[in-house]
Swiss-Prot record:
Heterooligomer composed of large and small subunits. Keywords: Cytoplasm, Exonuclease, Hydrolase, Nuclease. It comes from Leifsonia xyli subsp. xyli (strain CTCB07). It is an enzyme of class 3 (hydrolase). This is Exodeoxyribonuclease 7 large subunit.
Length: 435
């Protein structure tokens, strides 16, 4: 039965198959045929991508084409007959537009894209895209000079992002160590062209930026084709570079069409060698500058010292310092003059005050009781020392003391006498004698 059934299947035409089931499965050839039919209905399509693999075998080209933005890749084949019609300079890393027709190989069960035409993406289109991105980033301020960080004068450790064993790495290290032998590098290798450029360079920048010992970062590549450098104008890479806290030096080395990383970086170097010279000071040049500075300082100090010596010599020739006795002599003359003037003023003051004292003495003498006594008046006192102002105060027989200008007399009161026509004005004074 099994053999009969196989014979019938092979010899008899099969009707259109229904849906495959467990009881009625499709043969592999039928499934493969249907897949090829579905794929062939797609026809030829123009696609844009980046060549990530390019190999030639037997005159044919076998390669892979990667999407420019998404993580998608397809293989392609260019037969030798077609290869003769496409640009001869196509290579890995180029951005291209290709006319591809999907082809499913039944025997091998593989899908390939047969290329009937392939050409570079127009430079005009690429430049237009870059200019739009440049304008956008400029409007956001990523190119402003004031946001650029200053490079350290002598970095202790320099971060380097470059291709492994590349000429750019050798140029940077050799020139930096020639200028300053003690300089240290921390190198992180990354793809510098192709589809891995953006993610690997971005990761390397962030790794070095997180290292506290790294004081400046150099991204170096030894020039190359414009299309090979497009990764250094990728928006995600540019924004990552703008967000670094460590100063960044771009040394891509392409003068004709500078990648946008040159605009975002804190410093743009024309070549990797130029980057080493801009980042690392030359020890020989610095020693020359030190010697020159010391010479300038010595010359300046000598000039200052000579100027001060001349000024001191000039001061010493002045009379005040040439002979100091004139100061004492002039002050001695002033002192003599002031002493004479003071003596004169004191003498005048004494004479004036002496005259005033004499005047006051005369006034005092004229007003004193002694002056009254000298004019012939007397003071009469009883035995108790009280002044007798009226006859009734000294009855007859009272012992009296009479004071005159020349002294005192003892007396005894007699009887009272009548008051004369011109009596004394002061009851305590007796009438003048000898009148």
């Amino acid at each position: 039965m099994r053999g009969t059934r196989v014979t019938e299947t092979a010899s008899a035409p099969r009707m259109a198959p229904g849906p495959p089931t467990l009881d009625d499965p499709w043969p592999v050839a039928l499934l493969a045929s249907k897949i090829r039919g579905w794929i062939e209905r797609l026809g030829t399509a123009w696609v844009e991508g980046e060549i990530t693999q390019w190999g030639v075998s037997g005159g044919n080209v076998y390669g892979k084409l990667k999407d420019l933005n998404e993580d998608a890749t397809v293989g392609f084949t260019i037969w030798s007959s077609v290869k003769a019609r496409i640009p001869a300079d196509l290579k890995q890393g180029d951005r291209v537009i290709a006319a591809v027709k999907p082809n499913y190989w039944l025997k091998g069960g593989t899908l390939t894209m047969q290329v009937s035409d392939m050409r570079h993406v127009g430079l005009g289109d690429l430049l237009e895209r870059l200019e739009r991105l440049r304008a956008q980033l400029r409007a956001e301020g990523l190119f402003r000079p004031e946001r650029k960080k200053r490079l350290p004068f002598l970095p202790h450790t320099i971060g380097l992002v470059t291709g492994k064993d590349s000429d750019a790495e050798k140029d940077v290290l050799r020139n930096a160590q020639l200028r300053w032998p003690q300089v240290r590098f921390r190198t992180v290798y990354a793809a510098v062209q192709g589809d891995r450029t953006v993610p690997e360079v971005t990761a390397a920048l962030r790794e070095l930026d997180a290292d506290p010992e790294v004081e400046v970062i150099i991204v170096a590549r030894g020039g190359g084709d414009f299309q090979n450098l497009l990764g250094f104008s990728d928006e995600s890479l540019l924004r990552a570079a703008a967000g670094l806290s460590t100063p960044l030096v771009s040394a891509i080395g392409h003068e004709a069409d500078r990648p946008l990383l040159d605009e975002v970086a804190d410093l743009r170097a024309s070549t990797p060698t130029d980057a080493a010279k801009r980042v690392v000071p030359d020890v020989a040049e610095e020693l020359v500058r030190v010697h020159q500075a010391r010479a300038r300082i010595g010359t300046r100090l000598t000039h200052i010292i000579r100027h001060e010596i001349d000024r001191i010599g000039h001061l010493r020739t002045r009379p005040a310092l040439a002979s100091g006795s004139w100061i004492v002599d002039s002050r001695a003359q002033d002192l003599t003059r002031f002493v004479a003037r003071g003596a004169e003023l004191v003498e005048r003051c004494v004479d004036r005050e002496a005259a005033r004292v004499a005047e006051l003495r005369g006034q005092l003498r004229a007003l004193s009781p002694q002056a009254t006594l000298e004019r012939g008046y007397a003071i009469v006192q009883n035995a108790a020392g009280r002044v007798v102002a009226a006859p009734g105060e000294a009855p007859a027989g009272t012992e009296l003391r009479i004071t005159v200008s020349g002294g005192s007399l003892a007396a005894t009161a007699g009887k009272a006498l009548p008051s004369p026509a011109q009596g004394a004005t002061n009851g305590s004074l007796a009438a003048p004698r000898g009148k």
